[in-house]
Amino acid sequence: YAEIEKERFKNNNTLKAFDDKKLPGKVKLKDEIVEYKQAEDIGLTSQEDLFKKSSKEVAKSIDKIGEVEGPVHISEVIKRVKDSCNMKRAGANLKKAVNGAISASENAGNIIKIGDFLYDSASNDVSIRKRHKPNIDLISDEEIAKNIERILVHKQSLSAKSLPKEVSRNFGFKSTSKKTANKINSVLDLMIADNRVKLDNDIVELK
């Protein structure tokens, strides 16, 4: 059942992104990009809070992070819990507690886990978010795909070479490393394979 839900969720995300394919009118691309917002007040304030509460109780904090930050990488979730509990490092016990809470949240149907990312099951909306210290490994394929799609809606077409730079700038990267470009291109390849975009003579366009 969980796998069916994940597929439905992924398909809904894809459909939602491409329902938005309508021409932007007077809206500028930069107006569609939002500042990355971190979850605060997640209900855990100390080490005792984390380790004395049941997985179901800690799951409420995971839900809050997912609601504010989803899609969010698990390592970011661990960091939020660590910081909220004023712990110096994310040791094995903390990771075990967080992973147990993630499982409880998944079982309750509040969070959907796809790969290393957590999604709020109540929302199919994926925003393009600008980060202060972006790391491409911590950005989901869905958010990268949404970024590519919105660029192509606004610009109509773009050279394959310049696309990674445009995408990375929207995420807050000041320069585009090879690793970042490779990840963006891998998502572009998936979009081409899915018939969502086409690549012709090095020019990328929406299908």
What are the roles of these predicted feature ranges?
Residues 7-207:
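C-terminal non-catalytic scaffold/interaction domains in large multidomain proteins
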Residues 1-2:
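A conserved SF2-helicase RecA2
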